[in-house]
């Protein structure tokens, strides 16, 4: 059986029809398919008819599924018009009894995508009106009158086509005429379903373009493709064993911190109605949990991503007289993700504070990066300081981060960290005894608390005499000659 698919790939949520069609093809196999035979329906012997029970039995045996699953799948096949009932056409369900069904011809399958237009439906209704001598169902009469008003300018063409099709149908033998009428009726029951029925083919608006369509190649597109393949050749290839080993190592390291896989302590607030978890893991809590502090040692990004970890790291950098590095990194993050209407003002402020000669919090970056940054500041945008930010980030990662993990500040934080104990869920069968679930802390409030903490840190004065005495002591040690 040769079946053409016309544009099915761009229809959303309809890819499963291909699988149904593959199953229907197997059902029509003369050797291993469903048993079919001639059946008499209303004095007419219909060829290739089958019973609903035979279809369900074949589906169960073919797919190794239960009777309930086979019934559900059979209903889908009937609703989408691949099998249609002969005795009760409007009942689009598969009955598990001796009710007769027949396979729909592939021309009327949904994936053929010839549009069910108003003109075709009007011709079908006009043909039925001629055949039944005006005796149509109520919803068909309404549709007939509506289409008569809608396409009145071509109604003569509709009537002429209906008469021609009716005349051609009368020339066929009785069996073929009855089979074609059943197929056509089943098609329109699916595509123009009666009132109250579920329209299974309603998938929304068509896409303007087909994403799978071959686009015309231009000089620009070919150049982009060549550039892409050249870059792909330059990439270093990694063995799959190395990649999989990295994934396994990462999973083992982070499994204890996964709230879904390992649970969360003291308890899940959405289940137990206990907000202690949110209180212990607030952004700038005084004493963090042990699991949170241990996570800072996984990698530098985990430390700098956590507001509390960043606060502790800033305290360490200030003792090493390099707190301006983290301050510059935070200012660059605010430039990228903050209010974009103030990009120019923020960029100028960052330059005066960190990059200008003699700046109050001057940072040490190489000359090449400084030249790139200064040139970019002539036309500032949110990513103008990326080169300098990356340089400072790598400097902190390779130099300061390792010393921080060995410092007394981190060890003291780890020693004081809280290790919460798990709590049991308290529930009550009486609704009035249950506490109302609370929502998580508001991000606005947490942001305000974080900004207030930053303001307090910025307001703290530095004892300049203490700093100068340390610098003098260092210079004095350098000048003293080593003992002989």
Curated annotation (Swiss-Prot):
Ranges of compositional bias, category Basic and acidic residues: 470-484
Record PTM: Phosphorylation is decreased by light exposition.
Expressed in which tissues: Photoreceptor outer segments.
Residue ranges of domain G protein gamma in the record: 219-280
Claim: Membrane is one of the keywords in the record: yes
GO biological processes: G protein-coupled dopamine receptor signaling pathway; intracellular signal transduction; negative regulation of signal transduction; regulation of G protein-coupled receptor signaling pathway; visual perception
Gene Ontology cellular component terms for the protein in this record: cytoplasm; neuron projection; photoreceptor disc membrane; plasma membrane
PANTHER family: LP21163P, REGULATOR OF G-PROTEIN SIGNALING 9
Protein name: Regulator of G-protein signaling 9
Organism for this UniProt entry: Bos taurus
């Amino acid at each position: 059986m040769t079946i053409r698919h016309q544009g099915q790939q761009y229809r959303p949520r309809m890819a499963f029809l291909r699988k149904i069609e593959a199953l229907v093809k197997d059902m029509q196999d003369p050797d291993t398919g469903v048993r079919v035979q001639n059946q008499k329906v209303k004095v007419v012997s219909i060829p290739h008819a089958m019973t609903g029970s035979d279809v369900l039995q074949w589906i169960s045996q073919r797919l190794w599924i239960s009777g309930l699953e086979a019934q559900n799948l059979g209903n889908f096949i009937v609703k989408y018009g691949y099998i249609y009932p002969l005795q009760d056409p409007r009942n689009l369900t598969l009955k598990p009894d001796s009710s007769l069904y027949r396979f729909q011809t592939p021309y009327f399958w949904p994936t053929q995508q010839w549009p069910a237009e108003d003109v075709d439906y009007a011709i079908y209704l006009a043909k039925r009106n001629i055949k039944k001598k005006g005796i149509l169902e109520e919803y068909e009469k309404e549709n007939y009158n509506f289409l008569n008003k809608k396409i009145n300018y071509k109604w003569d063409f509709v009537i002429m086509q209906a008469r021609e099709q009716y005349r051609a149908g009368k020339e066929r033998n009785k069996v073929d005429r009855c089979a074609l009428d059943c197929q056509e009726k089943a098609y329109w029951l699916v595509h123009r379903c009666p009132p109250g029925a579920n329209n299974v083919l309603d998938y929304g608006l068509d896409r303007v373009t087909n994403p799978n369509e071959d686009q015309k190649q231009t000089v620009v597109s070919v150049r982009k493709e060549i550039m892409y393949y050249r870059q792909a050749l330059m990439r270093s290839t990694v063995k799959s064993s190395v990649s999989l080993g990295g994934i396994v190592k990462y999973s083992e390291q982070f499994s204890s911190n996964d709230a879904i896989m390992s649970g969360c302590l003291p308890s899940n607030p959405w289940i137990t109605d206990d907000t202690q978890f949110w209180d212990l893991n607030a952004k700038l809590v005084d004493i963090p949990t042990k699991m949170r502090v241990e996570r800072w040692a996984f990698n530098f990004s985990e430390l700098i991503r956590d507001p509390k970890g960043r606060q502790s790291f800033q305290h360490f950098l200030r003792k090493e007289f390099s707190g301006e590095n983290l301050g510059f990194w935070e200012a660059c993050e605010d430039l990228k993700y903050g209010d974009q209407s103030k990009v120019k003002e923020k960029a100028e402020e960052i330059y005066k504070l960190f990059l200008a000669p003699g700046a109050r919090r001057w940072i040490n970056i190489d000359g090449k990066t400084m030249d790139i940054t200064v040139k970019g500041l002539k036309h500032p945008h949110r990513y103008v300081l990326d080169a300098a930010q990356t340089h400072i980030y790598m400097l902190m990662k390779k130099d300061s981060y390792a010393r921080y993990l060995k410092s007394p500040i981190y060890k003291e934080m780890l020693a004081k960290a809280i290790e919460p104990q798990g709590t049991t869920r308290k529930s009550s069968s009486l609704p009035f005894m249950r506490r109302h679930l609370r929502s998580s802390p508001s991000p606005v409030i947490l942001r305000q608390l974080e900004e207030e903490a930053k303001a307090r840190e910025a307001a703290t004065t530095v004892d300049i005499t203490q700093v100068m005495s340390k610098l003098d002591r260092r210079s004095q040690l350098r000048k003293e000659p080593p003992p002989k």
